[in-house]
Amino acid sequence: MKFFIDTADVNEIREANKLHFLDGVTTNPTLIAKVKKPFWDVVKSILAEVPDKPVSLEVASTDAEGMIKEGEKLAELGKNVVIKIPMTPEGLKAVSYFENKGIKTNVTLVFSPAQALLAMKVGASYISPFVGRLDDISHTGMDLIRQIKQIKDNYNFKSEIIVASVRNPVHVIESAMIGADIATIPYSVIAQLAKHPLTDIGLERFLKDWESVPEKPF
């Protein structure tokens, strides 16, 4: 399973990358707005931080022509740029255009198996179903991941499933158990993955006992 970080904060990307399990980055307009810096400065700094990993950068237009124009400009920034496109009929047109040119795409805001099927059918490199937002409206987001995984396996679609809108470590573990390709995770949740209260208690006890060891070698 691959781990992406869902952020536009270069400091968070840098810290996550130090853990040596980061495989990519996803961003969106909301995350970029939080940084409060010029758009091009933000995306260029992200790409410089992880030049060898895929970075999803989202278009802002709602029509295919505008998406293509914006996406081509983004793609010029580097070979690791993935064009993030909303799951709409116009978006699917843009996805087909980019994939036919060898430019990777990430179809975002996927909330149903039907949407995922269409995105996989047109050849999207990645699809991003949002589990947390489904949970917010009293649906079970992970059920969607199971359905999409089954469809993908039935037809051997090449699209990689990015579990998005991850809210907690349970989402990550359930994604791994289902067999999703990728989870894109906020930095706060990445930090939680390595923690367990019993680990902290055990380490504290070991350190305390270590102090009583005579003639310690180091």
UniProtKB/Swiss-Prot annotation:
- Pfam families (UniProt xref): TAL_FSA (PF00923)
Pathway, per UniProt?
A: Carbohydrate degradation; pentose phosphate pathway; D-glyceraldehyde 3-phosphate and beta-D-fructose 6-phosphate from D-ribose 5-phosphate and D-xylulose 5-phosphate (non-oxidative stage): step 2/3
Chief location of this protein within or outside the cell: cytoplasm
The record, for PANTHER family, names: FRUCTOSE-6-PHOSPHATE ALDOLASE 1-RELATED (PTHR10683:SF40), TRANSALDOLASE (PTHR10683)
Residues in the active site? K84
| Cellular-component GO terms for this entry | cytoplasm
Instruction: State where the protein is found.
Output: Cytoplasm
Return the broad EC class.
transferase
What function does this protein fulfil?
A: Transaldolase is important for the balance of metabolites in the pentose-phosphate pathway.
Protein name from the UniProt record = Probable transaldolase
Q: Which cysteines are cross-linked by disulfides?
A: none
**One biological process term in Gene Ontology:** carbohydrate metabolic process
Protein species of origin? Sulfurihydrogenibium sp. (strain YO3AOP1)
- PROSITE patterns on file: TRANSALDOLASE_1, TRANSALDOLASE_2
